Amino acid sequence: MHSTRIIYKKRSKLFGANIRLNCPSVGATETLIMAASLAEGRTVIENAAREPEIQDLCQMLNKMGAKIYDSGKEKIIIDGVHKLHGCTHKVIPDRIEAGTFLIAAAATSSSITVSPVIPNHLEAVLNKLEESGSKIIIKGNSISIKGHKIKAVNIETAPFPGFPTDLQAPFMALMTIAKGRSKITETIFENRMNHVDLLNQMGSSITLKDNVAHINGVKKLRGMTLVGLDLRSSAALIIAALTSKSVSYVYGLEHLDRGYENFEQKLSKLGIEIKRQITKRKINESNYDKSNQNNKEIVGIRAA
């Protein structure tokens, strides 16, 4: 490897191996499983990720003829096969999307039901929502939440079954208006707190040191024109905007659309005015990549 370049040489085929991951990375685990499924011999992956999406992938691959054992555990065994065949498989519900809407309901003191969802996949999130004051009711493949006065709670992201890093930013938006002082610790990714400055622009009181955010809850946030820098921070800004009594415009929805389908239409069911608008107005915010504009229309969300 030379700086940002990777030099590789193609081999005629892959062979099984014993691999131990330094950290239980979801992407690395998925990639290794898919490669090992068609490799010659046995592959053993230790310290593998245990996220539900890993288990779902393994179930589909096994339907296609793969031989994968113990998915969902820290040690996964794969016996390579010569070929795979087609199958029909229903992907599990998106737990991160479901969690985002539950957090949005808590932030706006709303009552909603999210379905279909697998409640066990969100146990860590549901526990924190209950701890922060919301009432949670689980019935089969649905979760109902009734938002209440928000209390400050501490969270620390962790691999599954811990609190998911993908819901750290939305939950921080919730904690900005909680009563009391909370602490959010990010242990999975570096530089995943770029939403802190944006939330502070809206009136929150967050102090960031390394990977730990200390939050003093405020009574309300103010509406702003802001630009989401990535998928989860965009969702967090919109949740924060929903709690404001004034109008907010959130841009950079090309990030949001990667992970959420019809996001604003679904959020409108919370009883809040939110809609997608088209504007040719230039954005002056320094954190926006102006190369994306190219004199094209820019999409934003209006929440009030």
Task: Show where each model-derived region lies.
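Structural preference for solvent-exposed beta-strand-turn elements
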Residues: 1-304
